[in-house]
């Protein structure tokens, strides 16, 4: 496989991931936040067994296996439940934007814990990304503290999970980079996520799962999308141009919001798009801060 083809496949993964906010929310509306997520990750895990394969975890570095498992499962649960618990579809898209603080945080953590070299661009990058998220949360009024507080107060758990998830995923990326040694535990991690969600589903009171043709269609679409996205990303990382893929990933907030708005029939305000662009620009500046010499 050529590098160009592998890079293109990796970029397809970014587009696929961009649909997940809308798809996870759509499934959760029929099957519940926990039940819907459990179904998605169960089917995705089965798909990954056939696309990526089931690795021999006995060969994994211990720190990668333990830390990677805990962090990956925690992040995916935070993401899925933050979208499912959102009060409205529009709020689910906002929650997804909060989660996209992770690219900037990943670079910050790489600087703090992995010795990544940087320059002054990291400061405006982080500030712009954070401002963008606050701008989104302010609704039509943009950067309005009162409106932000009022908005978050309508579904505090949802926003808290998304914010926590951004930090967890940044930590996961840092740990993977430091301890993985070329091993890929994604199949195991997705299956563990499914197990954790099913335990939560059966051990706590949950709404009944109501299956309908639209919900089933969204469920299989979400599972296939998630499974193929991880498989495609793996091809890109192994054989493609990682730099191009990294730059492409920083435009995910805009793509994700556009696709979620389409899938959920939830139009977004001009102020929202301003905030989304800020998140992308801030993330790109953080990335450039580690590239300039």
From Swiss-Prot:
GO annotation (BP), single: amino acid transport
Name of a matching Pfam family: EamA
Cell compartment(s), UniProt: Cell inner membrane
Record note on disruption phenotype: Mutants show increased sensitivity to methyl viologen.
Gene Ontology, cellular component aspect: plasma membrane
Domain of life where this protein originates: Bacteria
Family annotation (PANTHER family): AROMATIC AMINO ACID EXPORTER YDDG (PTHR42920:SF24), OS03G0707200 PROTEIN-RELATED (PTHR42920)
Protein known as: Aromatic amino acid exporter YddG
């Amino acid at each position: 496989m050529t590098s160009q083809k592998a890079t293109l496949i990796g970029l397809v993964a970014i587009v696929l991931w961009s649909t997940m906010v809308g798809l996870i929310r759509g499934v959760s509306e029929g099957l519940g936040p926990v039940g819907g997520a459990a179904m998605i990750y169960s089917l995705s895990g089965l798909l990954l067994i056939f696309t990526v394969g089931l690795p021999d975890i006995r060969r994994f570095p211990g720190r990668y296996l333990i830390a990677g498992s805990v962090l990956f499962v925690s992040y995916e649960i935070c993401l899925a439940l933050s979208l499912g618990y959102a009060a409205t579809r529009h709020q689910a898209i906002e929650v997804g934007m909060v989660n996209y603080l992770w690219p900037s945080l990943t670079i910050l953590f790489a600087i703090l814990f992995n010795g990544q070299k940087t320059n002054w661009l990291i400061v405006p990058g982080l500030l712009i990304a954070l401002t963008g998220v606050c701008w989104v949360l302010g609704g039509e009024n943009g950067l309005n503290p009162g409106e932000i507080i009022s908005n978050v107060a309508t579904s505090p758990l949802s926003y808290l999970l998304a914010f926590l998830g951004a930090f967890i995923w940044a930590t996961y990326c840092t740990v993977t980079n430091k301890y993985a040694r070329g091993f890929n535990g994604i199949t195991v991690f997705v299956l563990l996520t499914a197990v954790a969600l099913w335990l939560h589903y059966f051990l706590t009171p949950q709404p009944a799962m109501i299956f309908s043709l639209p919900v089933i269609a969204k469920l299989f679409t979400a599972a296939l999308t998630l499974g193929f996205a991880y498989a495609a990303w793996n091809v890109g990382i192994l054989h493609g141009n990682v730099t191009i893929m990294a730059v492409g990933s920083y435009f995910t907030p805009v793509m994700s919001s556009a696709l979620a708005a389409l899938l959920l029939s939830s139009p977004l305000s001009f102020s929202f798009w301003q905030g989304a662009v800020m998140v992308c620009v801030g993330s790109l500046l953080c990335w450039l801060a580690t590239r300039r010499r």
